[in-house]
Amino acid sequence: MNNIGLYIHIPFCNSKCPYCDFYSFRADDDTKNRYVSAVLRELRNNSKQLNCKADTLYIGGGTPSVLAPDYLCQIINSAKSTFLTDDAEITVECNPFSLGDEFFEKVSECKVNRLSIGLQSANDGERRILGRRAGKSEVQSVVSRAKKAGINNISLDVMLGVPGQTKESLKSTLDFCISSGVPHLSCYILKIEENTPFFRMRDKLPFPSDDDTADMYLFMCEYLEKHGIMQYEISNFAVPGFESRHNLKYWHDEEYLGIGASAHSFLGGKRTYYPRDIEYFISGNERLTEGDGGDEEEFCMLALRLREGLTQERFYARFHHEIPQKMLESAKQYEKYGLCSCESGGIFLTRRGFLLSNSVISEIIL
């Protein structure tokens, strides 16, 4: 069995952003204690059942850094003793306002080697609308302290399509990210999810038009690459060698184990998940079955999110035959519109194709 990825969900936040639809909430110390105990239990139990190793650990949320640093280290050290290889990539998502000196001391001790920091925007007005407290000075301080702690693999989150955002304000955010020296950016187009404050206010906020957001996306891709930060997935950019190993497992349709409320797993061709219910997870209930995974359609859908696209080599290695001719013919219909390219028998989307990825990919693979 190849090395899997390990994801641990920490559903706690001090405050919820108005656009966020992830499973997260404020919690008291007793709830956090019981939750961490349940995570440690599931790490032990799953290691006995699976008999495999993981070469990536991603602790996401929520805001994992709102946990006491000792709790985080307990989780990471347990993951090391049960699953992780010696060279594992260990990522912790964090909010700049929840990072004190003890955090950096502890994560350095337990060999965290990657941080993902929520910036979203370097523009004060945009951050206020997004409910983000941390400004440029706080984020730069965190980046500097992380590097002093020996963590140089740092990612910043950036958001496009923010109310009031312009190409000029986006460029200012990108310039800040570039000047901070981080080697990775995750840049997402804001999606208005139901059951969020943004959804209820959608007619009252000055969202950029779809055309303006598309122009900003294309500008961002070109601007970052001019500065050596290369696009490798629809929403992800990195200095070569600093791509997220964990997230590449998802896009390569590789196996991963998810632990925690709302966490999903893909193992043995089956997709399972824990519901968005913390007490369900704490009580030790089993994962629910989502269905089969890893078929040709899913593999192609995920591969086409990558800049490298769907290659004959990777497809053949997985399914022992070439990409179906029908799929290649469908892709060629979009090639003439500049939305994808078919080279060496493979398929990859152009940047304009990425903007329409949901519809283009579904048409190609169906």
Q: Model-found features: residue ranges?
A:
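C-terminal alpha-helix/helix-terminus motif
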Residues: 47, 158, 360-364
